[in-house]
From Swiss-Prot:
It is found in: Cytoplasm. Keywords: Cytoplasm, Glycosyltransferase, Purine salvage, Transferase. Pathway: Purine metabolism; AMP biosynthesis via salvage pathway; AMP from adenine: step 1/1. This is Adenine phosphoribosyltransferase.
Length: 179
């Protein structure tokens, strides 16, 4: 009999990366383990199985991997949210806050139809700057963002609370204390 997969132990932690004092949560080890990847996707999908979801929006880059798998499981379309200048057609953009300043992300202007139910998916939520920007971008196009889903939450950084304050429920599979 197969032993149950512990998602937390499937994620590698790299100390002092990308700078001293940071504990980097490397999800590539989970993605490379077929059983762990499958379990993570199944758990992200489970609350919405049987629910009408029009689109899954994934943030560059690991949100593309997870979001594509979730979209497939839910028979929903997939919408990439990218850094400014990376999409080839007419776009809508939004500026968002990072720990170290501002950045911009964009989405194709025709990626979401007003009223579509969208779930935002990414690998990790920390301060919530990127996810807050993505929610704002989707809402700018008229989407109803029904949830934001992450494999990892770093609750000490408060990002999930920022998303919930926007009226968007947050689902995270595991959490790591600290940064």
């Amino acid at each position: 009999m197969n032993k149950p997969i512990d998602l937390k132990s499937a994620i590698r932690t790299i100390s002092n990366y990308p700078k001293p004092g940071i504990e980097f949560r490397d999800i590539t080890t989970l993605l490379g383990d077929a059983r762990a990847f499958r379990r993570a996707v199944d758990e992200l999908v489970q609350p919405w199985a049987g629910t009408k979801v029009d689109k899954i929006a994934g943030m560059e880059a690991r949100g593309f991997i997870l979001g594509g798998a979730v979209a497939h499981q839910l028979s929903a379309g997939f919408v990439p949210i990218r850094k400014k200048g990376k999409l080839p057609h007419t776009t809508v953009s939004i500026a968002y806050s990072l720990e170290y300043g501002l950045d911009e992300m964009e989405i194709h202007a025709d990626a979401v139809v007003k009223g579509e139910k969208v779930i935002l998916v990414d690998d990790l939520i920390a301060t919530g700057g990127t996810a807050t920007g993505a929610v704002g971008l989707l809402q700018k196009l008229g989407a109803e963002v029904i949830a934001a889903c992450f494999v990892i939450d770093l609750p000490d950084l408060g990002g999930a609370k920022k998303i919930e304050a926007l009226g968007v429920p947050v689902r995270s599979l595991i959490s790591f204390e600290g940064h």
